[in-house]
Curated annotation (Swiss-Prot):
Signal peptide: none annotated. It catalyses: GMP + ATP = GDP + ADP. This is Guanylate kinase 2. ATP binds at G144, P145, S146, G147, V148, G149, K150, G151, N304, D305. The keyword Transferase applies. Monomer. It is an enzyme of class 2 (transferase). Disruption phenotype: Growth retardation, narrow and dark-green leaves with elongated petioles, root growth inhibition and reduced fertility. The double mutant atgk1 and atgk2 is lethal. The active site is at R177, R270, R281. GO terms for molecular function: ATP binding; guanylate kinase activity. Essential for recycling GMP and indirectly, cGMP. Required for normal development of the gametophyte and embryo, in association with GK1. Its EC number is 2.7.4.8.
Length: 389
């Protein structure tokens, strides 16, 4: 047997406040979704704006109501909706009688992205993301010897397409270079702290590289994917091997130098390492290049000789060229029957058409396919339409 949705709310059209127009305690409390110690009440207007659905939070422990910062563009007010609590701090909202580009939404209330935003903003935060069909783009792992130009290529990509790509900020125990900012280039971390976090299972991968510890925390990747951007990881070959073995379905690119002499020249010209460190990095480069070319980890190899040409090849490889649109992934809306019931069955949501003279269409939404997301962004949904008799 399936479970009924957490709740169904009727008549939430614009102008029909249904008890949610109030600043403090909403009157209609049975329409709240309980997650941990907090109830999330979805309805009425967002900060008096009649175009967007509002959210309020009740904390059971403090018995206080708050209006969170709402990230992303949320759904328009609607006739009614079903709300279903999903794992990992998300609420699925399925609207009634809405346009195909406004029918399925996710409210993030306790994801890593939300927790990070809460820390930053110092207040309650939630984020909306719209549900669309299709799969989110795979993260990109870029490896190559030190000084080959990985960081340069990634910076060019992020500068040209800031809304499309996001950088996974690694942790490292090495000291910051003079222009490097904590939390932007790396999370500069004490070795004992990082070792403890590795032990606590917080890292997707880690490795000792040129005498220091480097690692990608699960949260660093989630922060990017939850912001709806395609995640880029700049990691060494050992790290790439670990990611390949993990559940992260990524594409792997290895950047080769035109020659060892050119690699050495670039490292020296960068001027960020001591002579001893340069020698160490060059020694390691040999083994890295061999592993990169022969390990079977990398499906794509780039030669960074001429920077502009290499960048163009990288863009082509990522499906970005002068003819293709670059403002995010092309999205497909979801047409739902005007009148329907919603049932949850394991990781499937069944949306059954109701009403006289209808075709009794059933839409099956596969929750296991959901990834990426928020705020205001899309995530992949796989839908099947079944005709019941
Ligand atoms: N095609 C190129 N031609 C000449 N110089 C380049 C080219 N690509 C990058 N560089 C320069 O080489 C130096 C090293 O590049 P970058 O810092 O991007 O390397 P990296 O692979 O990220 O190194 P690391 O792994 O140590 O972080 C930089 O000074 C950069 O400006
Ligand atoms: N396995 C990992 N390797 C990483 C990570 N972050 C960076 N790196 C690699 O380290 C070297 C040196 O970087 P530098 O900033 O000190 O020059 C470079 O090859 C990076 O790709 C990581 O999280 N995991």
């Amino acid at each position: 047997m399936g479970e009924a949705p957490a709740f169904f709310v009727d008549h939430l059209e614009n102008g029909y406040t249904n008890g949610f127009g109030v600043k403090s305690e909403p009157k209609n409390r049975d329409t709240s979704v309980l997650i941990g110690d907090r109830s999330f009440v979805i309805g009425g207007n967002h900060e008096g704006n009649p175009l967007f659905l509002g959210v309020q939070i009740h904390d059971k422990v403090t018995n206080k109501w708050s209006s969170p910062s709402v990230l992303g563009t949320g759904p328009k007010p609607c006739k009614g909706y079903s709300a279903i609590v999903l794992p990992k701090g998300r609420i699925l909202v399925i609207k009634k009688g809405s346009a195909s580009d406004d029918s399925i939404w996710f409210l993030e209330v306790d994801t890593p992205f939300i927790r990070e935003q809460k820390k930053l903003l110092g207040r309650e935060v939630v984020a909306w993301s719209k549900g669309v069909r299709g799969n989110a783009e795979k993260p990109i792992v870029i490896s190559g010897p030190s000084g080959v130009g990985k960081g340069t290529l990634i910076s060019m990509l992020m500068k040209e397409f800031p809304s499309m790509f996001g950088f996974s900020v690694s942790h490292t125990t090495r000291a910051p270079r003079c222009m490097e900012k904590n939390g932007v280039h790396y999370h500069f971390t004490d070795k004992t702290v990082m070792e403890k976090e590795i032990k606590d299972g917080k890292f997707l991968e880690f490795a000792s590289v040129h005498g220091n510890l480097y690692g990608t925390s699960i949260e660093s990747v989630e922060v990017v994917t939850d912001s709806g951007k395609r995640c880029i990881l700049d990691i060494d070959v050992q790290g790439a091997r670990s990611v390949k073995a993990s559940s992260l379905d990524a594409i792997f690119i290895f950047v080769c130098p035109p020659s060892m002499k050119e690699l050495e020249d670039r490292l020296r010209a960068r001027g960020t390492e001591t002579e001893e460190q340069i020698q160490k990095r060059l020694r390691n480069a040999d083994a890295e290049i061999k592993a990169g070319k022969s390990s079977g980890i990398f499906e794509h190899k780039l030669y960074n000789d001429n920077l502009e040409e290499c960048y163009k090849t990288l863009k082509n490889l990522l499906g970005i060229n002068d003819l293709a649109p670059v403002n995010g992934v092309e999205v497909e809306g979801i047409n739902l029957p005007k009148e329907h019931t919603v049932t949850k069955m394991d990781d499937k949501i069944l949306i059954q058409e109701t009403g006289e003279g209808t075709k009794n269409k059933m839409i099956v939404l596969d929750l296991s396919s959901i990834n990426g997301g928020a705020p205001g962004r899309t995530r992949g949904i796989v839908l099947d339409t079944v005709k019941s008799s």
